[in-house]
Amino acid sequence: EYNEERGKKVIKYVKNFLDETVPIANASWKEISDIKVKGEDLVFLIGKKENSLKDKQQFIGFNGEKNKLTSILVKKNKLHIDILIDKDNMIGKSDKASIANVVIESALSTIIDNEDSVAAVDSEDKVRCYRNWLGLMKGDLIANMNKNGKKFIRRLNPDRKYISRNGNKISLHGRALLLNRNVGHLMTNPAILLKDGSEIPEGIMDAFVSTLCALHDFKNKNNSRTGSVYIVKPKMHGPEAVSYIHLRAHETRHDLV
């Protein structure tokens, strides 16, 4: 249940944040009653008076109509801030400018772990890990959920679409940058047996399969913007371990090519 008193404090905090991050010239976000787009600029209404951003170049794009916005995209330190506007929203109703939410782009990355945070000890476990990573690289991973009697499907967030200040289309990544954490060098796994019957070094298997799965992303670039795969190799205790994995990674790259 929405707590209106707490909501007022949150709104005040957010307006202070916007005043510091994307300040309005000679005014405060607390004062505005409406926001519109005129030409290539944002216009903030305080009564009948019009104001603009102190730095107009912070305005990147928007959604909705210029006189009836549903979101505003601004930028600070190369990270985007999406200001959502909805006068019918429970929070938007309590704000003079109908601001319902503020979504901040994160510079964080996300590690998909094959080691300490999962108990992948046999072939079936490893296949499950690889299948999840493949789904992330192809962008089609889903999870069927049942929570409190309600069934729903979780999917990867789509890219976020906007109209730029000059009328062009903008697309921003809607997902965090993913890295794959392989297992350490000392582990072996019976999922693949070598010619002599011994188990494959699990870190080598992880490196090969996780890179193979990432080939799907090289084409569509849903994860990497540069057509790369990001692999974390843990527990390297000295130059010998680093040299070992560097050599094996170089050989794997040539095999894949």
Model-found features: residue ranges?
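Conserved small/polar residues in nucleotide/adenosyl-binding loops
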Residues: I245-T252
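Catalytic or ion-translocation cores adjacent to nucleophile or general acid/base/metal-coordination motifs
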Residues: N223, R253, V257
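Active-site-facing alpha/beta catalytic cores
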Residues: E1-Y244
